[in-house]
Amino acid sequence: MEKKKFYMTPAIAYASGKPHIGNTYEIVLADSIARYKRFQGYDVFFQTGTDEHGQKIELKAEDARITPKEFVDNASSEIKRIWDLMDTSYDKFIRTTDEDHEKQVQKIF
């Protein structure tokens, strides 16, 4: 018998700096739900990640005297590090600057 599928994705964190308590609260709740659904026997796919586009990022990168790409690389790796430190059970960590993500968005629009 095939397991029922369950897809979980919280809002992805905006990569304008370190995650705040709201980001952390949300990922803990999402992780709890994903773990509970797995316990219930569901085939769970839990995805999280970072949103890495926007003027705020460009301005923060400018202030830090680095490129926007360097800025989001640093912010995204810090967010991922914290989620991993908390042993979050996500299956995939996406970044909106990932080549695959950009291709899929272009297909839609």
Where are these regions (language model features)?
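N-terminal, positively charged nucleic-acid-binding surface of large information/translation enzymes
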Residues: 1-109
